[in-house]
Amino acid sequence: MKIYLDNCSFNRPFDDQASMRIKLETDAKLYIQEQVKQHVLHLTWSYMLEYENSMNPYKNKRERIAAWKVLTVQTAYETPEIVAHAKTFQTHGAHKKDAIHLACAVALQCDYFLTTDKSLCNKRRFFRPLQVMNPVEFVTDVLEGRP
């Protein structure tokens, strides 16, 4: 199963864990990472992840996130098709960077796009064929097979 984690998901473990929602999303993201390490899930990467991570002012976070690139099965680089698809996603309310992430996931033929961004999850019906999910939903509904 091929997945795309957006920048919000990669950064979730570094957020303040006082909120139960953030703690649950962190635990789910860490579980997903373990599934990647065990080759149960196939992680993808993109030029937008590379760019956003390079802009992170915290060297430790930047390096820890960048280390995941070696475990990826594919990387998406900018193409006219990705740019065009991103523009379509923007017409449905995705911000520019989010739209590029979504378009990269489509180009990589990912089964799931995982994000902790509530706004993207609330607009998921506009981003088909991608299945946009929060990491907690993905773990409970997909990996553990709960309806």
What are these regions (language model features)?
Residues 1-45, 54-62, 139-147:
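Short, well-structured N-terminal submotif of metal-dependent ribonuclease cores
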Residues 77, 96-99, 115:
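Short beta-strand scaffold positions
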Residues 48-52, 69-91:
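Acidic catalytic patch
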